[in-house]
């Protein structure tokens, strides 16, 4: 896994030869699942499986099941801010107010916007979480399987919400943020519009434009003046 060093002091850009060799090992078709034995086989030597794109979301769903088992009706299941579930209401008997991080501020407390949330899962992915820069290029941890390189799709942050009607919403939103980030704003929005009812999202592009689906544009509060909503018609609001 050539970009595993991203976010460490020894991060480096792989050579074209290293990338070409690694690309030959990419593909879900090379993953064999044996449900009876609960086993997985990787067809080629050197392959690996990285569950980073779904692990937090899966954990959120499992904690939610534990809450349900013990009759807990209100609470915030928060795995580091990037994957969470807002259950019921907060101590003020109001929706939980979830801050979405500004993708270009070093201080993680700087928010792009706030989203009131109740009985819904939320995940956010961005190119600011783990990255290094070399030659004026930002190399981040969200890889495009088609190139083997960090995705250069025009997106810098993606937030997806799934309400309680969506099964395994934590894992699904975790997965979708990565997929939509790789697709980029235009393709990502079209893809989200094909999703079942109960799923909505917001994509931030490199020009600080917010592309949204569902009623996200109306629900986002305290939006930073750095950002504008993209209307899809070529005009900004």
Over which residues does each language-model region extend?
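Mature catalytic core of soluble alpha/beta enzymes
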Residues: 1-237
């Amino acid at each position: 896994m050539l970009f595993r060093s991203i976010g460490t002091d020894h991060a480096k850009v792989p050579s074209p030869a290293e990338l070409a060799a690694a690309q030959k090992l990419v593909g879900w078709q090379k993953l064999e699942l044996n449900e009876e034995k609960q086993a997985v086989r990787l067809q080629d030597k050197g392959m690996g499986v990285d569950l980073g794109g779904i692990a937090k979301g899966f954990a959120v769903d499992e904690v939610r099941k534990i809450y349900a088992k013990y009759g807990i009706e209100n609470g915030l299941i928060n795995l580091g801010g990037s994957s969470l579930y807002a259950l019921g209401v907060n101590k003020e008997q109001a929706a939980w107010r979830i801050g979405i991080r500004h993708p270009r501020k070093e201080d993680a407390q700087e928010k792009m916007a706030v989203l009131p949330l109740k009985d819904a899962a939320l995940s956010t992915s961005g190119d600011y979480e783990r990255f290094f820069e070399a030659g004026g290029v930002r190399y981040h941890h969200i890889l495009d399987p088609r190139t083997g390189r960090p995705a250069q799709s025009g997106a810098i942050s993606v937030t997806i919400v799934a309400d309680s009607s969506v099964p395994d919403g934590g894992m699904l939103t975790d997965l979708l943020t990565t997929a939509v980030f790789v697709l980029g704003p235009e393709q990502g929005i079209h893809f989200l519009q094909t999703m079942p009812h109960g799923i909505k999202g917001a994509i931030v592009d490199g020009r600080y434009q917010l592309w949204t689906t569902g009623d996200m544009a109306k629900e986002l509060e305290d939006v930073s003046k750095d950002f504008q909503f993209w209307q899809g018609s070529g005009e900004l609001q």
